[in-house]
C-alpha cells in the first residue's frame, strides 16, 4: 500500500503546536522498555528537575487495575475475514531486539513491527502492519495504547508530576500536546509523521476505577486497513519536549 508522508513544516501551522515547532532548545526524550512486553514503560525528559514519568505505571503500582497489557505501543484491532470478526490484541512480542528499539508481534497472520529511534533529541516510533497470510484481511477498530499520565491524585503531585493530554485527532495532521499540570516546562508533544489518527478511546475509567480523578488509558485510533497477502501499512509519529 502507498505511504502518506506528513511534512514537518505543514504541521507547524497547526494552532497549539506552532510554538512547539519553532522551539530550538528541546531537551532529550528518554525512555525505557519493558523486557517482557516490548512496550515503553517510562518516558522522561532530560534535565527535568521533577524527573516526571509522562506515562502511567503499568505494573499495578499506580492503579491496581492498570497492568502491563496497557503499555505504550501495545494495542488491539478487530480482524474481519470471511465475514467473521475477532477482536485481537498484541501484547506479547515474538522478538525484542536492540533493547526494545525493534519489537515484533504476531497475531494470527498479522505481523506488527515496532521500530524506535532517536533523531536528535526526539523519539521516532514507526509501526508496520503486514499481512503474512494467504487471504485478504480487513483490520478495523485499531488502537495503540498511549497511557499519558493524566490523572489527579493530589495537588502537589498534579502540579509537578502529571499532565493534561490535549488530543487533536486531525487525520494526517493529528497531534497530542501533553502539558504539565503546573504549567511549567518541559512539556511533551507527539506529532504524526505518517498515516492518520481518526479518533481516540478511553479505557479503565468508571465509577469504580478512579471516576473523574483519572483520564483512564488513552489509545489512539488508526483508520481501517485492508491488507492483501504481503501488503503492509506504515504509521509513525515523533515525540519531543517543548517549552509550551
Indicate where each model-derived feature is located.
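Acidic-aromatic substrate-binding/catalytic surfaces of carbohydrate-active enzymes
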Residues: 27-104, 150-198, 204
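Asparagine-centered strand-capping/turn motif at beta-strand->loop junctions
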Residues: 129-134
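Type-3 copper protein
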Residues: 112-114, 137
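Bacterial Sec-dependent N-terminal signal peptides
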Residues: 1-27
